[in-house]
Amino acid sequence: MAASPDLTGFALDRARMIDTQLRQRGIRDERVLNAMATIPREEFVVARYHPDAYADHPLPIPLGQTISQPYIVARMLEAAQIAPADKVLEVGTGTGYQAALLGALAAQVFTIERHAELAALARIHLEHLGYTNISVITGDGSEGLADQAPFDVILVAAAVPDFPPALFHQLAEGGRMVIPVGSPELQALYVVRKQAGRLQRTKLDDCRFVPLIGNQGYSPAR
């Protein structure tokens, strides 16, 4: 479906992103596509990168972090098979873009960010857009959020060396976790399902994320 000739500015950029970056690469979940066609990615991007807000690559955000490529965001959301009644945990809030998408798809979202400055920025963005079903927490995302578990879906937006046991334990039976696992330089993106208390994993793609720093992630650089 081609973008409407009546669209301009960021609305046109969003429509082109949906058509050329997502639909043409096989994203089919209409709820995911509708959320990404509606939520203003430019609100979560540093001002100088506004012209590239819908470009087909990651963008820098403060403190050496990144906002992921739109296709990877869509791939993760689609793989998670999020239902409207689901409770979701996101690890790695960044400036809040993926949390906003999750808030449009799920009933309740908890998102953890290690950097207090980014967590505060995400809260501002999400409150500005009127979200009331998203809680932003500052902390070690690799440990999850045990006092709110279990979660139907866990999305991890930073790379881990191995599957963190804490996150798997906090996943509901039948739940899905989408997570990049591997070296700091290159990872495999997996969808993990919890069936009869066991981990069943399927590789989706190769990918590259910033490392998740934490007790069950990577150690801080010395």
UniProtKB/Swiss-Prot annotation:
Keywords: Cytoplasm, Methyltransferase, S-adenosyl-L-methionine, Transferase. Pfam families: PCMT (PF01135). GO terms for biological process: methylation; protein modification process; protein repair. One of its GO terms (cellular component) is cytoplasm. GO terms for molecular function: protein-L-isoaspartate (D-aspartate) O-methyltransferase activity. The active site is at S68. Disulfide bonds: none annotated. Its EC number is 2.1.1.77. CDD domains: AdoMet_MTases. It catalyses: [protein]-L-isoaspartate + S-adenosyl-L-methionine = [protein]-L-isoaspartate alpha-methyl ester + S-adenosyl-L-homocysteine. InterPro entries: PCMT, SAM-dependent_MTases_sf. Coiled coil: none annotated. It is found in: Cytoplasm. Its main location: cytoplasm. Belongs to the methyltransferase superfamily. L-isoaspartyl/D-aspartyl protein methyltransferase family. Catalyzes the methyl esterification of L-isoaspartyl residues in peptides and proteins that result from spontaneous decomposition of normal L-aspartyl and L-asparaginyl residues. It plays a role in the repair and/or degradation of damaged proteins. This is Protein-L-isoaspartate O-methyltransferase. It comes from Koribacter versatilis (strain Ellin345). The gene is pcm.
